[in-house]
Regions:
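Single conserved hydrophobic/aromatic residue that forms the stacking wall/gate
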Residues: 1-6, 10-11
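Short secondary-structure boundary segments
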Residues: 12-13, 71-72, 143-144
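Soluble non-cytosolic domains of exported or imported proteins
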Residues: 15, 31, 50-53, 68, ...
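Sec-exported extracytoplasmic/periplasmic mature domains
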Residues: 25-30, 42-45, 60, 64, ...
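Flexible, solvent-exposed loop/hinge segments that line or gate ligand/substrate-binding clefts
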Residues: 88-119
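Mature extracytoplasmic/periplasmic domains
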Residues: 110-170
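Extracellular/periplasmic bilobal clamshell ligand-binding domains
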Residues: 157-195
């Protein structure tokens, strides 16, 4: 079960959270991930609905105690780019990074991959190289508020000042395990009643 038993939470639908549960399967086994998923469902304040910002808005409105959301959406709301209402809501909540005494917080990623047999391999590699350039990484940090992937590019000040950087990230779980465990993740989430 969830570590904050008795707290009502809001979270997106099961499809959106498959990578999170897949990482739990990889690290803790399918049985433990199934129990965790049951704990999530039993603590849901409502049936999953809306995007990450809707989860944060629900906590700010007192509809739930905890929201599971990607932090870059909180920073986006704090920026005011999504309007005064969302900015005000974001100021009412605080980010919390779970699993700090173990492998660290699960991190979703934005990624690019080259398809085997791609007809324009050189251009595809050039695109990936560009995405990893300081120019592109600064775009990600300043416009989507994601964490940069390369040294020399700093996170957006909204992230640094409001979310902090002093947390342990799960850098040990191989991202490839997310794909490998997707079917099992959906299976345990569905069995738990996670819509």
């Amino acid at each position: 079960p969830l570590c904050l038993v008795g707290s009502e939470m809001c979270i997106r639908d099961s499809i959106y959270n498959k990578s999170l549960v897949a990482s739990l399967i990889e690290n803790n086994g399918k049985k433990a991930a199934a129990e965790w998923s049951k704990g999530v469902v039993s603590n849901m304040a409502r049936t999953p609905k809306g995007n990450d910002r809707a989860q944060i808005m629900a906590v700010a409105a007192g509809e739930a105690d905890i929201a599971v959301a990607n932090t870059y959406y909180l920073a986006l709301m704090l920026s005011g780019n999504k309007g005064a209402e969302q900015q005000a809501a974001a100021k009412k909540v605080k980010a919390f990074f779970p699993n700090q005494n173990d492998r660290g917080t699960h991190m979703n990623i934005s990624c690019a991959a080259l398809v085997k047999g791609a007809p324009n391999k050189a251009n595809a590699i050039a695109l990936v190289d560009f995405l990893l350039s300081p120019e592109a990484q600064e775009h990600f940090t300043n416009n989507t508020f994601e964490f940069p992937m390369i040294a020399g590019v700093s996170p957006n000040p909204l992230v640094v000042n409001n979310l902090g950087l002093d947390f342990k990230q799960d850098l040990t779980t191989k991202v490839s395990s997310y794909g490998k465990n997707q079917a099992a993740a959906l299976e345990v989430m569905t069995a738990a009643g996670w819509k």
